[in-house]
Amino acid sequence: MSTRADGRLDDELRAVVITRGFTEHPAGSVLIEFGHTKVMCTASPTEGVPRWRKGSGKGWLTAEYAMLPSATHTRSERESVKGRLSGRTQEISRLIGRSLRACIDLAALGENTIAVDCDVLQADGGTRTAAVTGAYVALADAVTYLSAAGRLLDPRPLSCAIAAVSVGVVDGRIRVDLSYEEDSRAEVDMNVIATDTGTLVEIQGTGEGATFPRSTLDKLLDMALGACDKLFVAQRDALALPYQGMSPEGPPPPKAFGS
């Protein structure tokens, strides 16, 4: 197995760091780092559901993805200034939402929404996969918050963990967790979202200027799923620590006689 420009083996993830309680106000707030890629993921419960969801008795989960203007080497203009979201931003936002909805029983939320926000602070490839992986941890913390507040119909609505990783063919070799330098010249580029129960949520894959055989697809998936297993361990280790956010306030104490 060959080494890469950054010294990693083909099947080796970049250093993964998950920091919970990164900001104070959201119910779930996480900074996730895949090497030099850093994404802030928050999960915020809000009252109500979209209009088309009203009356269903079920909640909703939505996600938004964005990059800070200086997340890359060259500053980009804020999309809010442009007045429109790029197709890439919309695609990744929907991907994150779909991925997280695969692991939660929305009926347990009642008619309430969890809004997930993923903001890329620094980009070096794999921002969407880092966002999905970190957003799951933020969601788990938001569920802990809602359960402590007595706002869930089912105190354990999460059925599985969700993680994502990039994988591709670079220099004729199958490699996992591509940096920007590798991703920009990959012959095959793929993103894999999986559950810790061994099932797949989504696969996004393209031959970048070249076709590839079924046997390569199988090898790509095998390497991606092996990497996701390592990400699940990182998620579990992070979530094993005490809840980092502010605990919900309980009901007000009964008034004293005569007050």
UniProtKB/Swiss-Prot annotation:
Instruction: State the superkingdom.
Output: Bacteria
Which GO biological-process labels does this protein carry?
rRNA catabolic process; rRNA processing; tRNA processing
The alphabetized UniProt keywords are: Nucleotidyltransferase, RNA-binding, rRNA processing, Transferase, tRNA processing, tRNA-binding
A single GO molecular function term of this UniProt record:
tRNA binding
Known catalysed reaction(s)? tRNA(n+1) + phosphate = tRNA(n) + a ribonucleoside 5'-diphosphate
CDD domains membership: RNase_PH_bact
Residues bound to phosphate are 88, 126-128
What InterPro entries does the record point to? ExoRNase_PH_dom1 (IPR001247), ExoRNase_PH_dom2 (IPR015847), ExoRNase_PH_dom2_sf (IPR036345), PNPase/RNase_PH_dom_sf (IPR027408), Ribosomal_Su5_D2-typ_SF (IPR020568), RNase_PH (IPR050080), RNase_PH_bac-type (IPR002381), RNase_PH_CS (IPR018336)
Question: What's the Enzyme Commission number for this chain?
Answer: 2.7.7.56
What family is reported?
A: Belongs to the RNase PH family.
Q: What does this protein do?
A: Phosphorolytic 3'-5' exoribonuclease that plays an important role in tRNA 3'-end maturation. Removes nucleotide residues following the 3'-CCA terminus of tRNAs; can also add nucleotides to the ends of RNA molecules by using nucleoside diphosphates as substrates, but this may not be physiologically important. Probably plays a role in initiation of 16S rRNA degradation (leading to ribosome degradation) during starvation.
Q: How does it assemble?
A: Homohexameric ring arranged as a trimer of dimers.
Protein name in UniProt: Ribonuclease PH
Annotated source species: Mycobacterium leprae (strain TN)
